[in-house]
UniProtKB/Swiss-Prot annotation:
Statement: the UniProt record of this protein carries the keyword Transmembrane helix: no
Protein name: Pyruvate synthase subunit PorD
Classification via InterPro entries: 4Fe4S_Fe-S-bd (IPR017896), 4Fe4S_Fe_S_CS (IPR017900), PorD_KorD (IPR011898), Pyruvate_synthase_PorD (IPR053389)
Entries under PANTHER family matching the protein: PYRUVATE SYNTHASE SUBUNIT PORD
Cofactor(s) needed for function: [4Fe-4S] cluster
Cofactor: record remark: Binds 2 [4Fe-4S] clusters.
Residues that hold [4Fe-4S] cluster 2 according to the record: C44, C64, C67, C70
Binding site for [4Fe-4S] cluster 1: C34, C37, C40, C74
Keywords: 4Fe-4S, Electron transport, Iron, Iron-sulfur, Metal-binding, Repeat, Transport
Source organism of the structure: Methanocaldococcus jannaschii (strain ATCC 43067 / DSM 2661 / JAL-1 / JCM 10045 / NBRC 100440)
Subunit annotation: Heterotetramer of one alpha, one beta, one delta and one gamma chain.
Pfam families: Fer4_21
Gene3D superfamilies: 3.30.70.20
Length: 86
């Protein structure tokens, strides 16, 4: 169990400045491969990954900076990257 105070659990530290336009790479989460370990949710520095009502994780691309920490922390490679198109 992770202490809630140890993570950003929702977008908000950049709420007035949507940081999604900074990306070079976009992380793509494959919920078929996901084992629900919550690493992506825990390690996202922007709180841009949220769990939906079905228990699947979704990336809020308005706030995702494309740092790919989520991809690096995923133990089952359920997150891949694609180059962002301008």
């Amino acid at each position: 169990m992770v202490t809630i105070a140890a993570i950003i659990y929702e977008p908000g530290n950049s709420i007035k400045n949507k940081t999604g336009t900074w990306r070079t790479f976009r992380p793509i989460l494959d919920n078929e491969k996901c084992v629900k370990c919550e690493n992506c949710y825990i390690f996202c520095p922007e709180g841009a990954i949220q769990e939906d009502e079905n228990g699947n994780f979704k990336i809020d691309y308005d706030y995702c900076k494309g740092c790919l920490i989520c991809m690096n922390e995923c133990p089952v490679n359920a997150i891949t990257k694609v180059r962002e198109e301008k």
